[in-house]
């Protein structure tokens, strides 16, 4: 345990010197203590008199049981106020388990376990973004090389981008100009056990993108990255060039929403500049700091540390578990497009026999309307999100949603509810 008199058990440093009264106990989870980003975070934490240490996640162990959960470092309990995860792709599974354990202990973690898991799976991230009307390049997930021809047609034809669902710093991303090459590459990637995506190629954004750093829902810095030579990937890691830019409101709004929807307090959002506006290419939960600090002159590391200092003591809550903890209760959603009979109806008409508020949100055009009144009128494209007793919600909705799309005589057994975690 760390305290102001003895900080030897976990090795966390007293940045303020002997006798300094403890402020924030901070751990940076990283396997690369000499990497630029890790060193900068450590430096800025020490400037602010934090107790701080870089901890190798592969040297930490987890104890789970009926007693209080624990995280051990060389046999000593790790007791901190805030954690900044810098988890590499190769140890995502263990890293996410560690973060989940810190969350159980009530420790603030800069990026939640769910946020990291979602962002590391490109397909899952794309599904979450598009569900909330965040613009992305058209993307197809394929399971066999025979699916390539159909995928090419759906994303707009050649050339296309072929990528693996999990990867970082531009690895596993290929620009392909012929169908034969796309089929050959897909076969190779699938045979290696990868999940493969075929993605629309945005010609007007060839070799460049915009990296936006979002911390706590605020835009901290933005830069344009350009590839060198014949390379089409613009990653700084791949020797691309960077320049500071002033971000437009449209691009800033998309970046903020993408980070928020993936539940990331610290995110690097990559945007393509297309003829139809900003497109989210990827959301990174461990964005590199060297390129962005060099291009903009902004102390991004300092902003991250100050954010953690402010939020230490407040842990992330798994809302899905909370909503399911009450027996018989849960979340039910209904899409108006699938049940057009609800179009033009008021919420009070649908739930006429329920006095309490059952509909806690309506998703409309990428936004959420919270706690809508009973007089709120539904329209096409809306999604009703309800919370309460599952059986009671189903009972109220059944007479309405039994009129399914293309089958107005559908029986209750064909009703389609979607029970989800929000």
Annotate each language-model stretch with its function.
Residues 338-400:
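Cytosolic Rossmann-like ligand/nucleotide-binding regulatory domains
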Residues 171-262:
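Phosphate-binding site of ATP-dependent enzymes
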Residues 24, 246-324:
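ATP-dependent carboxylate activation and anion-phosphoryl transfer catalytic cores
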Residues 20-31, 36-43, 52, 76-78, ...:
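Active-site nucleotide/adenylate-binding loops and adjacent lid/helix of ATP-dependent enzymes
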Residues 316-352:
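Extended boundary segments
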Residues 102-104, 375-376, 394-420:
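Short, compositionally biased
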Residues 2-7, 12-110:
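ATP-binding N-terminal substructure of ATP-dependent carboxylate-amine bond-forming enzymes
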Residues 214-218, 274-276, 365-366:
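Short acidic-glycine loop/turn motifs at beta-strand connectors
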